[in-house]
């Protein structure tokens, strides 16, 4: 039977498996890419605030 244009096709078990695998890969990338990048950005902000607000040394 022909597939109508407006109707989405039914998801097969193979499609479901591929989608599940893609979601796992996305979760893995979050822990390996996003979190370290976020940590570096936060560290840079902390260092900048520390340098900007430290008292000037008078000698």
UniProtKB/Swiss-Prot annotation:
<feature type="region of interest" description="Disordered">
    <location>
        <begin position="1"/>
        <end position="27"/>
    </location>
</feature>
<feature type="coiled-coil region">
    <location>
        <begin position="9"/>
        <end position="31"/>
    </location>
</feature>
<keyword id="KW-0472">Membrane</keyword>
<dbReference type="InterPro" id="IPR027960">
    <property type="entry name" value="DUF4519"/>
</dbReference>
<keyword id="KW-0175">Coiled coil</keyword>
<comment type="similarity">
    <text>Belongs to the SMCO4 family.</text>
</comment>
<dbReference type="GO" id="GO:0016020">
    <property type="term" value="C:membrane"/>
</dbReference>
<protein>
    <recommendedName>
        <fullName>Single-pass membrane and coiled-coil domain-containing protein 4</fullName>
    </recommendedName>
</protein>
<keyword id="KW-0812">Transmembrane</keyword>
<feature type="compositionally biased region" description="Basic and acidic residues">
    <location>
        <begin position="9"/>
        <end position="27"/>
    </location>
</feature>
<feature type="transmembrane region" description="Helical">
    <location>
        <begin position="32"/>
        <end position="52"/>
    </location>
</feature>
<dbReference type="Pfam" id="PF15012">
    <property type="entry name" value="DUF4519"/>
</dbReference>
<keyword id="KW-1133">Transmembrane helix</keyword>
